[in-house]
Each structure stands twice: as C-alpha cells, then as structure tokens.
C-alpha cells in the first residue's frame, strides 16, 4: 500500500498540475473561470491553465477588455494577459490591508482598506483617490473588518463586515441605510461564526452572501428574511470556509472553499434544489479566496458578474 502511494505521488509530480484530470471534467457542465487565492489563474473549460499570474490574490474580475483587475493585500493592479500592469493603486498609511477591487460603472475602481482608518475608496484611472468614506466594521481586528464590497446599480455600496455579523448598505456619502444580520438564530447565532464574506445584490432585489466559518451560503429578501440557504448538510461536508460565491445567469449558485489544498474539491455549483451540478478540484483552485465563472459550455456569462 505504501509503495503504491509513493508511486502515485511521484507520477503526479512528474506530469504536473497541467494534466491532472479534474472532477469538473466528469460532468456535462464545463466552465472556464478565474481563481483568486493562493494562486491567481484562468482555467479553461478543458481544465488547462490559460493564464497564471505571479502572486496570490484576494479579489478581482476579468474585465470586458480581457484585462484582469486584481486585489492583493497591499495593492490593486489591472494587468494584461501578458502580465503588463496598466493600472495600480497602493495601500495607504496607516492602514494595513486591501480586500476589494471592483471596476465601477463609471470606469473608476472601488477599493476597500482595512486598518485604523477602514474606508471605501473610489480611485480614478491615474491612481488618485477621488472619493472616500469611512466604514463601520465594529472591530479593531484589521483582517476581519471587511471583505468583498460591491457597488450597486443605485450607486450605493454593499459591504460585508465579518465580526459585525452584518452586511451593510451605504450611500455614496457613507450614510448607513440598511443592515442584514447574519447572526440570526435560524443560522445558529453567533456561535456558528457566520462571518459574511460576500455581499451580492441579485437582480430580484435579494442579497446573497457566503458565511465563511459558518460553512453556508444564504439569500436574504430586502427585509433581511432568509429565503434560501445551503449548508454542509446539503453537500456532504464539502464546504470548508465558504468564501467566494457567484450567482449565475441560469440561477445556479457557485461557492468556493478557502481551506482546501491539493486535489480537494474547492468550488461547487448547486441549483436551487441544492443539487451539486459541477465541481472543481483543480490544483490551481486550491485555497481559493474568490473566483469568477467566465463561460459555461462555451457561452460567456452575461453582464456584470454577480460575485
């Protein structure tokens, strides 16, 4: 048995991650997708890497131009497929981390900074901050102040605050207008550590979030009531620190698990009935922080990604 395991390990080391078959290849659904985490890469529908960047990342998008917008702990970059940096913003002092990068409808870039002055920024193409307001994370724990903030079509901003157990909606001037609590008793209360990681406003007005240590994803109606949720009980324990999430055009939900390594299943797609319809255990996706599904069976996901 030991010799067989050694032989398998050596074989995998020789052929490399480029040719390791994935669970995703065994289903009728095929995706190309951007992974953001321990590795930063675009994986094709054939499960081969199409682009790999030099550093791990936290957040990002493939833009309509084909360039990739990326958030790192200390900076934001827009890079070409040739890895040329065409836009950048560096973390300001005295803050300690960056968590978000999103290209806004007006062409500027949304950035969030964590630290002694947690704030949401709008950055112009020349890297200058043209607008900002303070965030309300309710904690001095820098790393857990916030994650994937997003601008809404209304111009407001939806921001997940982990240790506040809350998703907060702010106006462009920083006024708090709505709060969705994630420490509800129906979700296990605060002991379940339902720390919100994503804050996704859906086309129907509901809000989707993934709840990290709570190992679940939840959809709230505009009043903050739970209308849909999926937990580890529904997926045979595949969730392990549910971080990134995306609602696809077909209504399915894709959810990533950050605490994964090697060939563990790190991303799954489920339908409304919570049936798993696609999985990825690609080595480049291990430790995924966030992701973006780009295509499904050759067809591009339309519009602004709901992620």
What are these regions (language model features)?
Residues 1-5:
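Positively charged n-region of N-terminal signal peptides that target proteins for export
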Residues 7-19:
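Bacterial N-terminal signal peptides
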Residues 20-24:
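Sec/Tat signal peptide C-region and signal peptidase I cleavage site
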Residues 25-307:
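Histidine-/acidic-rich catalytic cores in large beta-rich domains
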